[in-house]
Swiss-Prot record:
GO terms for biological process: epithelial cell differentiation; glutathione metabolic process. Belongs to the GST superfamily. Kappa family. The modification N6-succinyllysine is found at residues 36, 49, 68, 74, 93, 116, 144, 158, 167, 177, 193. The modification N6-acetyllysine is found at residues 68, 74, 85, 93, 116, 158, 165, 167, 177. This is Glutathione S-transferase kappa 1. It comes from Rattus norvegicus (Rat).
């Protein structure tokens, strides 16, 4: 038997486009590196409040930079993202509380669907400029991910329960305890040590810490399979 897989925790919120990039890279490398990836839906607003930080898009110059950067990142990471037309009005102001509670419920009851449902919620915001705050739209994302309608409705009914609310607060709090000040935050547990890395552009450093090979955001072996 080889060495046990290193555990990586990925804290993310579907409001964050950079979380999507980090998510896709780690989902690709989980099949190439000796790692166990734990997806941990968290609430960006809670992390910002705890750390005293604010989202990059809320800083005017950073917001303008993001508009120019995302089309380039789309090509580099091969993730079908584009900036929503009214991101601040439609998505930032409405927030993602219900969507993240839904993902929390998925993680608790049907964790094998968490990757696919998370991806579909990102696709709605960051690829098709669609809403994820209304119940029917959350259901649509779950169904598109392959979840049965009855199960999706069951999980949607759970988002108002204290159990799910508490779990999301707990996960967000765990990220804060690690020192998170934004998302995505990746926590690597390596040889008894814990490393907290921020952003989707720390993957080469992560590979170094893991003793693994970094082959870019779209590894050649993945291209060969595709």
């Amino acid at each position: 038997m080889g060495p046990a897989p290193r555990v990586l925790e990925l804290f993310y919120d579907v409001l964050s486009p950079y979380s999507w990039l980090g998510f896709e890279v780690l989902c690709r490398y989980q099949h190439l590196w000796n790692i166990k990836l734990k997806l941990r839906p968290a609430l960006l607003a809670g992390i910002m409040k705890d750390s005293g930080n604010q989202p990059p898009a809320m800083v005017p110059h950073k917001g303008q930079y993001i508009l120019k950067e995302i089309p380039l990142l789309k090509q580099l990471f091969q993730v079908p993202m584009s900036v929503p037309k009214d991101f601040f009005g439609e998505h930032v102001k409405k927030g993602t509380v219900n969507a993240m509670r839904f993902l929390t419920a998925v993680s608790m009851e049907q964790p094998e669907m968490l990757e696919k449902v998370s991806r579909e919620l990102w696709m709605r915001i960051w690829s098709r400029d669609e809403d994820i705050t209304e119940s029917q739209n959350i259901l649509s994302a779950a169904e598109k991910a392959g979840m049965a309608t009855a199960q999706a409705q069951h999980l949607l009914n759970k988002i108002s329960t204290e159990l799910v609310k508490s779990k999301l607060r707990e996960t967000t709090g765990a990220a804060c305890k690690y020192g998170a000040f934004g998302l995505p935050t990746t926590v690597a547990h390596v040889d008894g040590k814990t490393y907290m890395l921020f952003g989707s552009d720390r993957m080469e450093l992560l590979a170094y810490l893991l003793g693994e090979k970094w082959m870019g955001p779209v590894p050649p072996t993945l291209n060969a399979r595709l």
